[in-house]
């Protein structure tokens, strides 16, 4: 069954806006789990703009929730990950001036270095993931460096969906779905797990949730936004319902 990983970075963003101690993203993780989240995603950025080291440490010390740590492929972050031992570590590109992650990791440009990073994480018993565009050359490179999971960047699909008036049958939207579908087929053929995420919401999630072989979707901003009005447990529950309905129908 398809799984949902809830990104709680935006809970920390609200807290950091006032440089205070609430809302607590760790409690947010508990609420998301009670709502049906299969795992929690946090991005410990180099500039610590939202999630802090103490948040990730407390998540490991006080909860039993499956943790996916998004991280840049730096020595500092690899050291932190190897100490914390999250269930999964996902390598992402990171720019100090970006509002959110703007594209997939360019593995081809740094293949040798990333292979070493993946090896260190795997030796620590951590499942390794890479966040990449739906590009067959990047997928093949992910396999060469030893990644266990490829998470496909769904931003281009989400933007096309919005630009075309939320019409899932618009040619531009169908073209993006086809790219992700093909990427998923390649990922699975190469023996890796097929995940996806970025800019997914309650309107656009179902066409992707029904793709063959997709294992997990990571969603954050839309769920936290919905939680403002209905609470976090209910926001997560609603997303899980949509995902499961789509997955059961399939393609």
From Swiss-Prot:
InterPro entries: Aldolase_TIM (IPR013785), PyrdxlP_synth_PdxJ (IPR004569), Pyridoxine-5'_phos_synth (IPR036130). The keyword Lyase does not apply. GO terms for biological process: pyridoxine biosynthetic process. Its main location: cytoplasm. 3-amino-2-oxopropyl phosphate binds at residues 7, 18, 199, 220-221. Its EC number is 2.6.99.2. GO terms for molecular function: pyridoxine 5'-phosphate synthase activity. It catalyses: 3-amino-2-oxopropyl phosphate + 1-deoxy-D-xylulose 5-phosphate = pyridoxine 5'-phosphate + phosphate + 2 H2O + H(+). The keyword Cytoplasm applies. Pathway: Cofactor biosynthesis; pyridoxine 5'-phosphate biosynthesis; pyridoxine 5'-phosphate from D-erythrose 4-phosphate: step 5/5. Pfam families: PdxJ. The record marks 151 as: Transition state stabilizer. Disulfide bonds: none annotated. The active site is at 43 (proton acceptor), 70 (proton acceptor), 198 (proton donor). GO terms for cellular component: cytosol. 1-deoxy-D-xylulose 5-phosphate binds at residues 9-10, 45, 50, 100. Signal peptide: none annotated. Belongs to the PNP synthase family. HAMAP family: PdxJ. NCBIfam families: pdxJ, PRK05265.1-3, PRK05265.1-5. Catalyzes the complicated ring closure reaction between the two acyclic compounds 1-deoxy-D-xylulose-5-phosphate (DXP) and 3-amino-2-oxopropyl phosphate (1-amino-acetone-3-phosphate or AAP) to form pyridoxine 5'-phosphate (PNP) and inorganic phosphate. Homooctamer; tetramer of dimers. This is Pyridoxine 5'-phosphate synthase. It comes from Dechloromonas aromatica (strain RCB).
């Amino acid at each position: 069954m398809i799984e949902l990983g809830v990104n709680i970075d935006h809970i920390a963003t609200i807290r950091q806006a006032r440089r205070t101690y609430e809302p607590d993203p760790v409690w947010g993780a508990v609420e998301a789990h009670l709502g049906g989240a299969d795992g929690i995603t946090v991005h410990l950025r180099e500039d610590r703009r939202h999630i802090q080291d103490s948040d990730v440490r407390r998540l490991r010390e006080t909860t039993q929730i499956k943790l996916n740590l998004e991280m840049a492929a730096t020595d500092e972050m690899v050291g932190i990950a190897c100490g914390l031992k999250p269930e999964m570590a996902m390598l992402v590109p990171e720019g100090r001036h970006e509002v959110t992650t703007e594209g997939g990791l360019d593995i081809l440009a740094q293949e040798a270095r990333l292979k070493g990073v993946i090896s260190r994480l795997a030796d620590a018993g951590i499942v390794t993931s890479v966040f990449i565009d739906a590009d067959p050359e990047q997928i093949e490179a992910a396999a060469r460096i030893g990644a266990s999971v490829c998470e496909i960047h769904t931003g281009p699909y989400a933007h096309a969906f919005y630009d075309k008036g939320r019409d899932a049958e618009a040619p531009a939207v169908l073209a993006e779905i086809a790219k992700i579908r093909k990427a998923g087929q390649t990922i699975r053929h190469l023996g890796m797990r097929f995940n996806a995420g970025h800019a997914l919401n309650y309107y656009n999630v179902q066409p992707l949730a029904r793709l063959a072989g997709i294992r997990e979707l990571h969603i954050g901003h839309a769920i936290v936004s919905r939680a403002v009005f209905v609470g976090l447990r209910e926001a997560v529950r609603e997303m899980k319902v949509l995902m499961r309905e789509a997955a059961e129908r399939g393609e």
